[in-house]
């Protein structure tokens, strides 16, 4: 058990594939983060927040949390809409479970110590050429402003540093989403600048603030 920002971090470590040189390694293309998929029974904990890989059985809780949080999520999450359904949840989860096992993206459920679903946090949009990825996160409205997202970002970052060959994790946030920007800052990410018209949300282009965490 290692100390992480004054909280405790607990996990079962997955194997690490070393970074590879050269341009035509097909196994690297299939596993762009350089992460081995032989041990996915990972649980990470910081204080009263736990991150674990998603399971398809999480679909009902995700759907409930999304509808509870529509007002807050819709402006900033392109996948969020009033007709979000259990089928949408299941389809997304099926894809993410496969992506996690293949080392293509790593989405985690944020849960309380008693197992209640709080939100999601993941390492995705992975580009192996420059060994970079993106961290995305959201928390259901009833759990906002309690440090849940900040703890989740810290855990996801440490997991990526210990279990993949990525050297840079970006957090891209719409300029108007000040709450998410505060999470990035509290998690220790560095604000690098504003990218014009970088995010398209519900068919509208938005300027975005770029934050980063590096190895």
Describe the residue ranges of each PLM region.
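Acyl-donor (CoA/ACP) binding surface of acyl/acetyltransferases
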Residues: 1-61, 65-72, 107-215
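Short, polar/charged, Gly/Pro-enriched helix-capping and turn/loop motifs at alpha-helix termini
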Residues: 76, 80, 103-107, 167
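Conserved GNAT-fold acetyl-CoA-binding loop/helix
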Residues: 74-94
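Short loop/turn motifs at secondary-structure junctions and domain boundaries
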Residues: 98-103, 189
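Generic alpha-helical scaffold signal
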Residues: 56, 67, 83-90, 104
